[in-house]
């Protein structure tokens, strides 16, 4: 029987999110074809591939997370990139990790015939405290959650 394909999308590939997503990919690789689309950050370990099972298919993203969720030109490029990755991988399930990948991914895959799961992890709007950026994230979470 053919394995189902899981596409993990992770912009915040560092710290606790890195540990969580790496372990999740490794735990799933026996039963699923796992694809990990990620963006490198300063917090990403230099030897990050050593933490991942060799059967995990790695896709480094160029546009996702470059400017967060507040730069329209960057966001459009990121959405196009996410749609191309989805087209290439043809996943059965897409699992979005953290706020930026969650926001852009839900925009990119809205209206598509995909099963999309979102895990926010750090809750960016809470960590930012009061202010304009925090309100944008809260609004985006509310709109995209429906």
Predicted regions and their residues:
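Active-site proximal beta-strand in glycosyltransferases
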Residues: 6-7, 93, 110-126, 141
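N-terminal strand-loop element at the rim of the active site
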Residues: 7-74
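A short acidic, helix-capping loop that chelates divalent metal ions and anchors anionic groups
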Residues: 66-70, 124-129
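Membrane-proximal helix-turn-helix segments that form the acceptor-binding/catalytic region
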Residues: 80-83, 135-146
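Short His-centered aromatic/hydrophobic patch
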Residues: 96-102, 120
